[in-house]
């Protein structure tokens, strides 16, 4: 890339930085005063004219200054080479705060609250999806001789409980056998594969009286409730930050709040995160969701030992501190995975 192109990118970078900081359109005079660009105000004006003609910046109808466009933000993000990692003190503070969580729910609640505070945006964390989780432990408890409670604990720390209504009563010996059979079929396997194995057991024991019926009914509950109808859950924090940035969204704040409440759009974007440690930035129309078109989303996946548990990230205005937000999202995701993987 030629010298003029490099210089224009430095001008664009300065416009983005100043607009994010001030929320005021940026003129050539202020760029000369605030940044050591090494050229005259006239040269900067010419560079700004080229950037505007190419669609990287635009002029608000009431101002002589310029603001970045979605294309300008995208160019800025694509050429980031100075995403400064959080300091050791900050990282230790994050790790210690998350490690203090007593269980999965508490860890994720802490994570979403922390991320909202770090970025001053709306933070979202997807609960670990059962379909990608492995079973760490399974327990079967007799509530009555004809009613069981099946408890599944995944490697991400998620606990799910399901009631199994039996067609007949089973005794303590059969209950022990059932627990052993289900444990052999499930533990260490992803739920989709484990449920198929349980169903195979059910077929093999179809003529075994009460035990075969119990295995079959348990398999049905596990298959239908834990695999085919996986409940997608989303934790959210910092929605008040949207109100603080209301001017950034024009008249679209209501539709953004409605999209967050419905969760479907956000879950779809988080579900696309399949690689822990890789941060994705979607700017404006890149979200492909009309309800949140005035926003940007910075997201990644979290997990442990090459297993992705779920997605997480932040949602805010396109006028966002992208380097700081990217660093915060990456750090919190890393430590969520480490904390959950160690349990």
From Swiss-Prot:
One of its GO terms (biological process) is negative regulation of DNA-templated transcription. Keywords: Repressor, Stress response, Transcription, Transcription regulation. GO terms for molecular function: DNA binding. Signal peptide: none annotated. It holds the Pfam family HrcA. InterPro entries: GAF-like_dom_sf, HrcA, HrcA_C, WH-like_DNA-bd_sf, WH_DNA-bd_sf, WHTH_transcript_rep_HrcA_IDD. Gene3D superfamilies: 3.30.450.40, Heat-inducible transcription repressor hrca homolog, domain 3 (3.30.390.60), Winged helix-like DNA-binding domain superfamily/Winged helix DNA-binding domain (1.10.10.10). HAMAP family: HrcA. Belongs to the HrcA family. Negative regulator of class I heat shock genes (grpE-dnaK-dnaJ and groELS operons). Prevents heat-shock induction of these operons. PANTHER family: HEAT-INDUCIBLE TRANSCRIPTION REPRESSOR HRCA (PTHR34824:SF1). NCBIfam families: hrcA. This is Heat-inducible transcription repressor HrcA. It comes from Mycobacterium ulcerans (strain Agy99). The gene is hrcA.
